[in-house]
């Protein structure tokens, strides 16, 4: 694999891991909003965010495995 592809995958995975770090805060925010009876369809967004979480984990692991293979 070329270094450009590896670096772009690492950049995308790094951005998605930032989203992954922010996920517990989003869950806490949604619980607060539900307690205040303000419904913003957060259940659909939480399922979407869990998909983003798994994609970020897969990209993170695959990009670092590709980096070690090229070394």
From Swiss-Prot:
Q: What is its main location?
A: plastid
Q: Name one GO cellular component term.
A: chloroplast
Print the keywords alphabetically: Chloroplast, Plastid
User: Is Plastid among this UniProt entry's keywords?
Assistant: yes
Q: Where in the cell is it found?
A: Plastid, Chloroplast
Its domain of life?
Eukaryota
**Name of the protein:** Uncharacterized 8.1 kDa protein in ndhF-psbD intergenic region
């Amino acid at each position: 694999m070329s270094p450009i592809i590896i670096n772009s995958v690492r950049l995308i995975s790094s951005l998605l891991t930032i989203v992954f770090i922010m996920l517990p805060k989003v869950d806490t925010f949604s619980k607060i909003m539900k307690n205040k009876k303000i419904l913003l369809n957060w259940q659909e967004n939480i399922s979407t965010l869990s998909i983003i979480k798994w994609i970020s984990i897969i990209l993170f692991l695959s990009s670092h495995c590709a980096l070690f293979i090229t070394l």
